[in-house]
């Protein structure tokens, strides 16, 4: 069938996608660049200007539906916020992700000289990263569209999450990864028995390949579109990315229905930071929390810092780079939402900075040794950048600050293996322990 742009679109467009009936709180898809509007469908690029599409909501309808009381009666997962997510019915692919701890970090705050510091600890998700939020959203929507195969391009955590959720949903699964990925992340995908395809190239090359496959595999012999493979971060990207808004909703609720003053989040594609910003904004617009400017700061590794570079040099574009960093989950050299993340940081008075691999390792150790949380390299980037921004005076001492920790360190043990102590080797007797300890009881 020909799906048409919504009636009030600035221009019309047609495509071969099968669109489902639009729920009353969803208006459709809208281009972030030219504003063209489309029906709800598995579509991610504007036909008129090739800009990215995102979900548009009927906020009057959401305001009628939602309230603090309705939210608090919901499940203790990300799905307590379903009124704000692009899924029509009950979530069909659900591992109970979300509602992870907001941990008050008094020890780290004292060391950095901050009055009030929290981490949003998304290592507590089902596959130990924030990706469970976006995957649950995307694949629940994919089931509504009638897709039977789940797929993704991934730097690791997304592959783990897609494989797990596909197993839960009874969907076939293909995950495409760079061939140099950490072994922990590869094993954490293989256990769910997906088809894992290791591509000899970096993430950006893997992503381009997946875009080609998505276009080819979802057309029949006559060239007509059919919903076969749901690439969560390609043809399902507008729905997938909305799941990150729950990172804002949870923080606001856990802080007592208020937004923080400042957040620091890692930047890979840039999508997460933009959606955290959108989430706070939606709740302010609907009166669920008081209006304020939340300073949005981003963190990158020096070896893959195109957004930080654009921020520092005040560029109106993000120049692609070739990644070379231990923070492989952030190694996206051509970030799709990088320019939007940069603009948000500038608009809110935040900052985007980058740190060296050595600082990343120290960031991992600092969080572990002060607050007992073992983060992967992306979290090391976040903590090291947090420290750098505080020392530069870009985060105020009295600002309530939240740092987003997006994945667990068990997946990236290689990064720190040579930078921590070794076990004491002793014989099984007290004298041997006293000798190794250097003291006697």
Please annotate each region the language model reported.
Residues 2-441:
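PLP-dependent amino-acid enzyme catalytic core
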